[in-house]
Amino acid sequence: MRILVSNDDGFHAEGIQVLATELRKIAEVIIVAPDRNRSAASSSLTLVEPLRPRHLDNGDYCVNGTPADCVHLALNGFLSGQVDLVVSGINAGCNMGDDTIYSGTLAAALEGRHLGLPAIAVSLDGRQHYETAARVVCDLIPKLHHQLLNLREIININVPDLPFEELKGYKVCRLGYRASSAEVIKQRDPRDETIYWIGPSALPEDESEGTDFYAVKNGYVSITPIQADLTAYHSLLSLQNWLDQEFTK
């Protein structure tokens, strides 16, 4: 098996290096990842400047682009040879609920799925036990691989920041959701100009049983299938009925 690994925290981030080291015990691995932190890049592609992959001594690559750029480039003729699976992560911090909209970690996996490959995104709910998350992925890949081949979705995995032995198990979950985002942070720079920072993520508002927030909070690995189709199917009929009524008045 040949696995393409990417992330949004950048090539030098601890998470991707720990993940690649563990994955190399079970497969051939090649990293194509951003050359710097591109967190919250979502599925953006770079269209107004060239991408410049830099070939590293160990055979991996870092790219002056987004996570989606990296996977798009790798799978559309840049890499020679077949790739069987895309794994994105390990993200420093969870990607649950509304986080998935902004996540470059998920975007890299979604780009792989869009280009026809099974894909996994993995995040750690903290910054300490990356080895736990890497081991979870390596344990799940042999079990999930054939199932992934039949899915049009990616698998989003969130791992509690605990030693592996303290994990309580695995739960298949739906996404929860957070409260409205915190206000932006207003400051003055050394030139006395006003600058703004995006504020921190809001606290979970729906962390009820069955959500990814609930699972991770209670020591379980959450596994959520994620799709690119954002259609709200449950609203199609009511919206059509409303439209029909408005145009027949």
Curated annotation (Swiss-Prot):
Q: What is its EC number?
A: 3.1.3.5
| Listed GO MF terms | 3'-nucleotidase activity; 5'-nucleotidase activity; exopolyphosphatase activity; metal ion binding; nucleotide binding
- Name the enzyme's class: hydrolase
User: Is ATP-binding a UniProt keyword of this protein?
Assistant: no
Localization terms from the record: Cytoplasm
Q: What does the record note about the cofactor?
A: Binds 1 divalent metal cation per subunit.
Cofactor dependency: a divalent metal cation
Q: Has keyword Nucleotide-binding?
A: yes
Q: Print the keywords alphabetically.
A: Cytoplasm, Hydrolase, Metal-binding, Nucleotide-binding
What is the first-listed, main subcellular location in coarse terms? cytoplasm
> Any one cellular component term from GO for this entry?
cytoplasm
- Catalytic activity of the protein: a ribonucleoside 5'-phosphate + H2O = a ribonucleoside + phosphate
Top-level taxonomic group: Bacteria
Similarity remark:
Belongs to the SurE nucleotidase family.
Q: What is this protein called?
A: 5'-nucleotidase SurE
* Organism lineage: Bacteria, Pseudomonadati, Pseudomonadota, Gammaproteobacteria, Pasteurellales
Gene symbol? surE
